[in-house]
Amino acid sequence: MASKSPEWNPTLDQAVAKERCGARSYSWETLSESDDVSAIAQKTYTNGFKCHMEYSLDAGSVEFLVPKDAKTFTITAGQSDYSRDTNVTVTFEISDPISDKVLDSASLRLNEAKEFSIDVSSVPRLKMKALVEAAPGESRKSNISITVIWADPKFS
């Protein structure tokens, strides 16, 4: 009988690298320590991390080392239900930062969520990146107000 790999829910404090969010360099915030409700598509989350972004083409990322014997990484991504701009699309991307190989991505609008499930058996490190897309005719100077959320991260 094969042994089941242990589950591990990484926290923001355990990240090995963090890229601040956008031109104003907002910091990533732990959902459990936030004063605001963190909800994606009407589902509330308390485990994970989020960051505020104010301009088109803003981006931010968080990286974790993959634990030994981990086979799968799951995480849910989306924009906070309380984001003020409803016409903004955010691309959520999970990659191997060592090889720069994109493992999965999704472009999500407000009220959309995606649960990623990534095979990490041969990946030493994961990078979760969020990039605010510029709508046609917009530029980096276009002001927006959204919060991106990565929720319920779990290695198993």
Residue ranges of model-derived segments:
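Gly-Asp-aromatic-enriched flexible segments
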Residues: 3-156
